[in-house]
Amino acid sequence: GFKSKCKQIDDKNYNFAFIGDSFTEGTPIEYEDSFVGIFAEKTGYKTANLGIVSYSPKIYLSKVNYLLQEGFKFDHLIVFIDISDFYDDTNFYSIDQNLKVTEKYSEKKNLKRRKFLRNNFPLTNFYMFVLKKYKFRSNHKKKLNINESPIFTDKVNLKAKWTYSNENKIEGYDLGIREGNQIMVDQMEKLYEILSQQSIKLSLAVYPWPHQLENDVINSIHVKIWQEFCKNKCENFINYFPIFFDEMNNSSYLETYKKYYFKNDPHFNKVGHKVLAKKLIEIIK
C-alpha cells in the first residue's frame, strides 16, 4: 500500500501523502491514470499513495502513525473517506491503545484478513493487490449499455446503504449509524492530533458512490459529518458530491453512472479519476 513514482519509492520525504481505500489506491487502473498519479504528474509534487483495498479510519490512523514513527515525512496528508469506510471500520476492525489494528472475529472467519494485510501493512499486501486487480480488470471489459441498470453485489449494496437509510440500526451492521460514525470521527481526531504534533497539514475529501447518486441527496450525511469534522482542523474539505449530482441533474443517473464508473461496480473509471484530479489540482496549489 505505498505507491509513488519509481524514482521516489525509496525516499522517506514527501510533499503529499494520500490515504484511503481501493478508490484511492486506484483499483483497477494504472497509477498514472489514477487521480493521485495525475495529481503527482501535473503538480510535480513528491507524492505517496498509501491507499489500499479495505482500509478505513482505524487503519488510516494506525498506518500513518506507523510510517511517521519509521521516519517518513509528509508536508500534507489528504484522506479520501469512502462510503464503505463506515461498514469496514465498525464491522471488521478493532484498535488498541497502542494504535495496533486487529480484525474482529478473525478466528471465526478462517482468513485473518490476508494475515491482516501482511502483518499490519508496512508497505505491501502486493499479492492480493495483483490478484484483485487482474480479476477486476477482466470483469470490466464490457461497456454498460446506456439503458442498462447496474447490478451490484449484495455486499456492495449493504455497504452503501447507511447514508440513505431511515433506520439507525441496519441489519448486517454491527453498530448503529450514530455510534459508528462517532467511532470513525474519534479515530480521525486522533490522526489529526498526531499530524498537528508534527506540523503536518490535513485535508479530507468525500465523493459519492453510484448508490448515493440514485438514492441519497447532495447534502448527504456523509458530507455533513466530515464537513463538520473539518472545521478548524482541515486545510481543505474537498466535496465531490456537487460535481456528480449536478451532472446527473443535467442528464440522468444512468448517463452519469456510465460516464464515470465501471460497469456493475462503484469504482471510478479513468474519466472519473480525471474529474477527481482536476478539482484536487484546482484546490491544492
Task: Give, region by region, the residue ranges found by the protein language model.
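Conserved SGNH/GDSL esterase-like catalytic core that processes O-acyl groups on lipids
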Residues: 25-106
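Solvent-exposed, polar/charged alpha-helical surfaces in well-ordered, non-transmembrane soluble domains
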Residues: 37, 41, 58, 62, ...
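Serine-dependent acyl-ester chemistry module
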Residues: 83-227, 235, 240-251, 258-259
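Loop/turn elements at helix/coil->beta-strand transitions in domains of secreted/extracellular proteins
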Residues: 14, 44-46, 72-77, 196-203, ...
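Histidine-centered active-site loop/cap adjacent to the catalytic His
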Residues: 260-285
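Membrane/wall-proximal cationic-aromatic binding patches
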Residues: 1-45, 150-170, 244-263
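Structural beta-sheet core signal
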Residues: 18, 79, 204-206
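Active-site flanking residues adjacent to catalytic metal/cofactor-binding acidic residues
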Residues: 20, 79-81, 238
